[in-house]
Amino acid sequence: GETLRFPDRAAVDTLPLQHPNGATGYRFAHKGRIACYISDIEHSEPWPPADLVRFVRDADLVIYDGMFSEEEYPRCRGWGHSTWEKGVALCRAANAKALAIFHLHPAHDDAYLLASEGELKAAMASAFVAREGQALAFSAVNEPA
């Protein structure tokens, strides 16, 4: 991947992701906080891959593609999407603090997503299903000079 650096010491790193049409993951670092955006990813076995674990290591938030349920995934293998369970496994391996599941299947209604979020929170208390219009804020932490 590539890295963009900005005068205010913000950095954006990229990582190619496994997807039939190609995709890119992003790691945003600024003022001691890290957020990673991992969309359009076909998870592989073994999971999670070492390069992705390094990429999201110690992130404050990982925003992850949770298009399918574990039950749906075998029928949709090769479509370039993943499951919330794989997002949890990635976050655990990388010591990420929170997980937002997005890129949701259009056939999954609000009731389904609420039920899934209950399972998600049971697996990782700081995880949630992202919602339209939702905004999150992180306070800056002291950075080394």
Residue ranges: model-predicted function:
Residues G1-A50, R54-F55, Q134-A145:
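Core dinuclear metal-dependent hydrolase active-site scaffold
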Residues S44-G133:
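Cap/insert and terminal regions of metallo-dependent hydrolase folds
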